Amino acid sequence: MNVQVDMGRALAARDWRAVAALAVAMPAHAGAGTITDDDLRAAGVDRRVPEQKLGATIDEFASVRLPEQIDGEFVEGRRANLAVFDDARVAVRSHALAQRNLLERWETEHLGGTLDAAGSGGGIQPDPILQQLVDVIAQGKSDVDAYATIVEGLTKYFQSVADVMSKLQDYISAKDDKNMKIDGGKIKALIQQVIDNLPKMQLPKGADIARWRKELGDAVSISDSGVVTINPDKLIKMRDSLPPDGTVWDTARYQAWNTAFSGQKDNIQNDVQTLVEKYSHQNSNFDNLVKVLSGAISTLTDTAKSYLQI
């Protein structure tokens, strides 16, 4: 197997299955320069931290409940711990910074030196995979920045909805053991505030807009200039289901409304969970890419040294 040729093909095509297979095979072919999972963690690139914290936001969001009546007894709802969402955003940004720093260090310390040794300045034709590595590193940095920005924005949105769901407790009460009172107008205002302040994210310059539209699906919309906007349809359905202030419903009608309203909340949760899964997949791709790149850089460095010894 010509690992270098296979590597070039996989990187050029961004064939992540092939890259993953090469990442497994690379230690057997590339020598001591190949990076390991422990090396990644030592460099601060530990995907487990942001993914665990994002998972905690999903669990926290899922645990939020509205008040209800059970057998004539009023049961208070459950509010969200909003600090969980702040922790997740910090972890995502820190992880992205560590990923970018690793790529930039390689680009400066290794590929820069390889270009100097094997580039046109030395009269030597560089290895054909070299430019692919430079391009892939640039694309890797772009993807890292884009995913971090989008996941941070979605987490902020998630937090805003969790905040509204928590504040609903203040506007729903029991009128008696058979009826619930809802100040729907006040709740509408809270939801409208979220709609009016939905985060907007900007994809990096030169990003493949069509690829990102396919990647992110209909939970967001992406303009031709790369502005990512969250789809407000689910929030609008929640807002429009609410009655005026002071409305009194019997428990059956209230429960029917609660089920539909909470169903839209669950749909928002599913959107965010899908993105978190894609973020996890992107992190896996990054780890595999790093392992392949480290083997390629090690090979290119050895080749450059051999040229200098001629």
Swiss-Prot record:
Pfam families from the UniProt entry: T3SS_TC (PF06511)
Protein name: Translocator protein BipD
Domains (record comment): The N-terminal domain is an intra-molecular chaperone that prevents premature oligomerization of the residues on the coiled-coil region that are involved in interactions with the needle and/or itself. The residues in the C-terminal domain probably form oligomeric structures at the tip of the needle that are responsible for the regulation of secretion of other effectors.
Subcellular location: Secreted
Entries under InterPro entries matching the protein: BipD-like_sf, IpaD/BipD/SipD
Keywords (A to Z) from UniProt: Coiled coil, Secreted, Virulence
Designated gene of the protein: bipD
Family of the protein in this entry: Belongs to the invasin protein D family.
Coiled-coil ranges (or none): 127-171, 250-299
Protein function: Required for invasion of epithelial cells, as well as for survival within host cells, escape from endocytic vesicles and subsequent actin-tail formation. Probably regulates the secretion of effectors BipB and BipC and their final integration into the target cell membrane.
CC terms in the record's Gene Ontology section: extracellular region
Main subcellular localisation: secreted
